[in-house]
Amino acid sequence: GKNSPYRVLAIPEKFTLYDFAYVITDSFDFDFDHAFGFYNHLTRYTQATEAYERFYDDPSTRYVCNPFTKGVEKTLVNTGFTEIGKQMLFYYDYGDRWNFRVELLRIEPAEPGKKYPECVQSVKKARQQYPDEDWDEDE
């Protein structure tokens, strides 16, 4: 929604969707330890007609994918995000069901000497990935 936290991220064009998924989760301080996918249906991934899933890259889980599904490990970001304004649902953790709306805002040449990926803008504090867990990392 309009009041949701969001991030503007600058990523290199050679990044795969897998790399991009890591950058998204990292920008929200999430662990990168769950299955995920990118879908062209923004509210219901099950109704998508274009999908890129982590499940596809693993031969033991590929059978759960739709015939049109592609993987994320070898698919470049510009394969999924083909034009300015293209939006996709980044669905992370099928158990906890985190929904991120991802949009290609612009394509710009890399600035010489700048390190990418970069979080260009961070609006609002991210929600906690595991809000109910009461554990100490030192234990």
What do the PLM-derived regions correspond to, one by one?
Residues G1-E139:
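Short linear regulatory motifs enriched in tryptophan with gly/pro/ser
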